[in-house]
Amino acid sequence: MHRIAVLTEQETRGAQMEEQIARFCKERGRFPRIEPYRNQESFFCAVLTASFSHAVIALPGVAGLNAVEHLRALCPACRIIWCSDLDFSLHAFRLRVDYFLLEPVTEEVFRRGLLVWLEGRTSIAPCSFDSNNH
């Protein structure tokens, strides 16, 4: 059984991501254990006791980068979707992240990431950029 961690500081956003993951998996006859975390300390304590098969890291700025780097060091085989407000796509490539999403993340783009992640499909686009052309 898949063990999926969702690390985000925002409770509402975390709940939305957890719901999307559960719905996506249910449509495919999969029923993973989804575990929400609102801070890095509790997340990494959990990683040390039992590794995750998959993780969504949705933290702002350098906090997200640090979390992904630390997770990769502790759990090299973990499949990762990383959502960030800063363009860390080159770091995501270096850290072997399955799917990198640049904020704002739409439900459609997140589902695309889940396809790559849970069904082993290859990524069409390594990152998603918003339409504001920053």
What is each residue range found by the language model?
Residues T8:
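Conserved acidic carboxylate
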Residues E103:
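A Lys-centered signature of the CheY-like receiver
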Residues E107, R111-H134:
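CheY-like receiver
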Residues A63-A77:
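Short amphipathic alpha-helix used as the core "switch/output" element in two-component signaling
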Residues E11-E35:
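Two-component/phosphorelay signaling modules centered on CheY-like receiver
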Residues V56-I57, A77-D87:
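A short, hydrophobic beta-strand element within the central beta-sheet of small alpha/beta folds
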Residues P36-S53:
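Acidic, metal-coordinating helix/loop segments flanking the phosphotransfer/catalytic sites
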